[in-house]
Swiss-Prot record:
GO cellular component, as recorded: cytoplasm; cytosol
Site positions for Plays an important role in substrate specificity: 228
Organism: Pseudomonas aeruginosa (strain ATCC 15692 / DSM 22644 / CIP 104116 / JCM 14847 / LMG 12228 / 1C / PRS 101 / PAO1)
Cofactor(s) essential for the protein: pyridoxal 5'-phosphate
Pathway: One-carbon metabolism; tetrahydrofolate interconversion; Amino-acid biosynthesis; glycine biosynthesis; glycine from L-serine: step 1/1
Residues found modified as N6-(pyridoxal phosphate)lysine: 229
Complexes and interactors: Homodimer.
Listed name of the protein: Serine hydroxymethyltransferase 3
InterPro entries: PyrdxlP-dep_Trfase, PyrdxlP-dep_Trfase_major, PyrdxlP-dep_Trfase_small, Ser_HO-MeTrfase, Ser_HO-MeTrfase-like, Ser_HO-MeTrfase_PLP_BS, SHMT-like_dom
Alphabetical list of Pfam families matching this protein: SHMT
Length: 417
């Protein structure tokens, strides 16, 4: 029998110490990685619940194990809330991650060797959209589209590639693109060549849920997302679709048993909490602020003479090109890290440097907005980043910014009492 008195701190002090150090880092550092956010205590409580003990292969009311009557309730809550949140007719909440959700979509609708048309990783796409190092680029014939000299998707070029290569699936989505996707145009192109339209909205799902970014569900055959990032839930995946019995059956079979075994019901419970939070009015206010904060930061960089890819942002992130300053993304990332500002180095269009070095930074505002930052704080923060980038090698500037970061983090804690 287990005793609830035997806490992790008592049982495994070494592990607990590392976790406490991470908690301290999150409180004392400013998080600007666009794909990161902070979950609520309720989300973490669900994910750390007794549901982790239960195997539940199959789907609600169609399980291969007994004793699933209560996890059926949990999973159905998550399904119903996801459908309500995004206006979908179908939702599969079982994918363990966004990449696995994407893999399931490919398994469901494609055969090995089929052609897919997706956004180039070098231009802001994602590994799973046909990059050569990903299974999506190895199992399928991946054709890539990119952005033009203005940093925008050239839809005429997308259409030309679609007509030329006749893809079975067109993938719309990104990991580093700061503008709004034209889902209606993607739909028209897909229809012209008889392709499925698959939208990966992992980065903007929270904005979509709040009505701050267009909803792809009415246009796409299938939509996937992660449940963290802007959605502010646990790490996991989600598949959505409009009513289509044939596609729904294929998607369910692709997730289980093709791609996964038993679902993680404790994570699904946390997803259900996240979806409930996203249905509240305050979530819309939060997402509106995420966008305002990103735009405020981007403008500071422009005013200070830095290059922002595509000239600004219409979502939660933007790419800062440091080619003109002859600063590598790797060095900028490290310098900011010493100032307790966490970003990620990122390739920029036509980057002359390798993906391990890069010439840019990707900056996002979901996490700082969760802390309570508004435009004033974000403008100040962007100014501190500029100070460091304009004085690379001057550790006194880094030291000064670090003290300012610690002070503002104390003023805006992630988890209050």
């Amino acid at each position: 029998m287990f005793s609830r008195d035997l806490t992790l701190a008592r049982y495994d002090a070494e592990l607990f110490a590392a976790m406490e150090q991470e908690a301290q880092r999150q409180e004392e550092h400013i998080e600007l990685i666009a794909s990161e956010n902070y979950t609520s205590p309720a989300v973490m409580e669900a994910q750390g619940s007794v549901l982790t003990n239960k195997y539940a292969e199959g789907y609600p009311h169609k399980r291969y194990y007994g004793g699933c009557e209560y996890v059926d309730i949990v999973e159905q809550l998550a399904i119903d809330r996801a459908k309500q949140l995004f206006g979908a007719d179908y939702a599969n909440v079982q994918p363990h991650a966004g990449s696995q959700a994407n893999a399931a979509v490919y398994l469901a609708l494609l055969s090995a060797g089929d052609t897919i048309l997706g956004m180039s990783l070098a231009h802001g796409g994602h590994l799973t959209h046909g990059a050569s190092v990903s299974s999506s680029g190895k199992l399928y014939n991946a054709v890539q589209y990119g952005i033009d000299a203005n940093g925008l998707i050239d839809y005429d070029e997308v259409e030309r590639l679609a007509v030329e290569h006749k893809p079975k699936m067109i993938v719309a989505g990104f990991s580093a693109y700061s503008q709004v996707l034209d889902f209606a145009r993607f739909r028209a192109i897909a229809d012209k060549v008889g392709a499925y339209l698959f939208v990966d909205m992992a980065h903007v799902a929270g904005l979509v849920a709040a009505g701050v970014y267009p909803n792809p569900v009415p246009f796409a055959d299938v939509v996937t997302t992660t449940t963290h990032k802007t959605l502010r839930g646990p790490r996991g995946g989600l598949i959505l679709a409009r009513a289509n019995e044939e596609i729904e059956k294929k998607l369910n079979s692709a997730v289980f048993p093709s791609a996964q075994g038993g679902p993680l019901e404790h994570v699904i419970a946390a997803k259900a909490v996240c979806f409930k939070e996203a249905l509240q009015p305050e979530f819309k206010t939060y997402q509106q602020q995420v966008l305002k904060n990103a735009q405020s930061m981007a403008q500071v960089f422009l005013d200070r003479g830095f290059d922002v890819v595509s000239g600004g942002t219409q979502n939660h992130l933007f790419l800062l090109s440091l080619i003109k300053q002859d600063i590598t993304g790797k060095d900028a990332d490290a310098a900011l890290g010493r100032a307790f500002i966490t970003v990620n180095k990122n390739s920029v269009p036509n980057d002359p440097r390798s993906p391990f070095v890069t010439s840019g930074l990707r900056i996002g505002t979901p996490a700082v907005t969760t802390r309570g930052f508004k435009e004033a704080e974000c403008r100040e923060l962007a100014g501190w980043i500029c100070d460091i980038l304009e004085n690379m090698g001057d550790e006194s500037v880094v030291d000064g910014v670090r003290e300012k970061v610690k002070a503002i983090c104390a003023k805006f804690p992630v988890y209050g009492n």
